[in-house]
Amino acid sequence: MTRALLSVSDKSGLIPFAKNLVELGYELVSTGGTHKVLIDAGLDVISIDEVTDFPEMLDGRVKTLHPRVHAGLLARRDLPEHMAKLAEFDITPIDMVVVNLYPFKSTIQKEGVTEAEAIENIDIGGPSMLRSAAKNFASVLPIVDPKDYDVVVNKLKAGEVDREYRKSLAAKVFQHTASYDALIANYLTETSFPENLTLAYEKFDDMRYGENPHQPAAAYKTALPEAYSVLNADILHGKQLSYNNIRDADAALRIIAEYEETTVVTVKHMNPAGIGQGQTLEAAWDQAFAADDISIFGGIVALNREVDAATAEKMHDIFLEIIIAPSFTPEAYEILAAKKNLRLLTLPFTTSIPQKLEVTSVLGGVVVQERDLVGESENNFTVVSKAQPTKEQLQAMVFAQKVVKHVKSNAIVVARNGQTLGIGAGQPNRIDSVVYSIQKAEKKPGFDEAVLASDAFFPMDDSVQYAAEHGIKAIVEPGGSIKDKDSIAKADELGVVLIFSGTRHFKH
């Protein structure tokens, strides 16, 4: 007689699976609530305390933590001395363990959950049984996922439970218990940067490929999902999101979260292409499109208001990969869904992104930092020039600062209030970004109102000089260079407003 031990929190699929095991000749052993469910279904089941000859105790905290259980799991069937020892102590081998764990994750997601409630939902016996079974996978089938029940039954019936399949189930167990423990560790940890960093993610999607066709890829969600994420967006129309789609859409969502005003953000290769605001969404679109009507092709568009028909008509004429918005009117959806390859996503928008750790892979490890969520406000500005800013210039500088923090360094943004005019991204030296952004901006309507924002300080006064000589009248930068005095002097010489924000926004 082969023996299966079942102890599950998630009862889905349990009864038909258990009945199949009985038909296959398994003797069932179970614990607590699982035992009751199986008995109520009319199955013959041995209670765990009949196996251990010891009652459950401490409010169920101790049920399966017993040598008669773990010896039955860990004994190697290919070692005569192991089997002899089981016989000596009259221990029956256990050939299958079916366990899923206390719902710690769903418990800590409940509003108002206490630490005591969370701790009571930390499973001890379940992971112990799973790990014992997984270690001895050559002899014991460890099953942690109800989705595997049908596959296991079919393989048992066909006699196809080979070593490779057993090994895959064992790997799944250790992945599951590691993720479970990581979730607990992160819940209990009170420091952002512990000595041992444990991260829990769950597969969201197998992707066609990564950044390029020769790179395999998958997407994973954090074990405790964030509501404001492209991975939680509803895909109303279009095919599966690609790796690059997800990265670009994420960049767009981060930028548009900076603004409460009606705003449209366009993104290409994770850099903003154009950003516009207006009294209506259509007007905001017009501003964003005019900001860079070339780079937008093949790009991502994020809008923080419901998409109406008028705006949809204008977007329909352009090749776009994704449009993401809180919602679409029926008319707007009909217009845009006519484009087969356009992906339409909905996601409730927010201007409050929670502070979390950002993890970046490097060869041999990761670097970890808190998100750059410093709010931009003219209250943080210090005017260091003799020239004083106008109200309109201050508003434009706040707008530009919210953009420049999302541009790859060295980053320069030329903008007027409510519209970017030129964006210089990713240049190895700052003056090149200054030159490029101004060249993009200077022939556009509204350049006479333009201000310039820099993500980091100017190491020399050449950026101030170039900007002033090409029509920029107000500049905002963090300050902090040993040559700040040179930049201030140049601004005063040329009559330019120079403001220090006090906050650097490098982005690599």
Swiss-Prot record:
Gene Ontology annotations for the cellular component aspect, listed alphabetically: cytosol
Intrachain S-S bonds: none
GO biological process: 'de novo' IMP biosynthetic process
Entry-linked SMART domains: AICARFT_IMPCHas, MGS
Known pathway: Purine metabolism; IMP biosynthesis via de novo pathway; 5-formamido-1-(5-phospho-D-ribosyl)imidazole-4-carboxamide from 5-amino-1-(5-phospho-D-ribosyl)imidazole-4-carboxamide (10-formyl THF route): step 1/1; Purine metabolism; IMP biosynthesis via de novo pathway; IMP from 5-formamido-1-(5-phospho-D-ribosyl)imidazole-4-carboxamide: step 1/1
Entry EC no(s): 2.1.2.3, 3.5.4.10
UniProt-recorded Gene Ontology molecular function terms: IMP cyclohydrolase activity; phosphoribosylaminoimidazolecarboxamide formyltransferase activity
Ranges for domain MGS-like: 1-144
Keywords: Hydrolase, Multifunctional enzyme, Purine biosynthesis, Transferase
Enzymatic reactions: (6R)-10-formyltetrahydrofolate + 5-amino-1-(5-phospho-beta-D-ribosyl)imidazole-4-carboxamide = 5-formamido-1-(5-phospho-D-ribosyl)imidazole-4-carboxamide + (6S)-5,6,7,8-tetrahydrofolate; IMP + H2O = 5-formamido-1-(5-phospho-D-ribosyl)imidazole-4-carboxamide
Matching InterPro entries: AICAR_Tfase_dup_dom_sf, Cytidine_deaminase-like, MGS-like_dom, MGS-like_dom_sf, PurH-like
Entries under PROSITE patterns matching the protein: MGS
Domain topic, free-text comment: The IMP cyclohydrolase activity resides in the N-terminal region.
NCBIfam families xref list: PRK00881.1, purH
Family, per entry: Belongs to the PurH family.
Name of this protein: Bifunctional purine biosynthesis protein PurH
Lineage: Bacteria, Bacillati, Bacillota, Bacilli, Lactobacillales
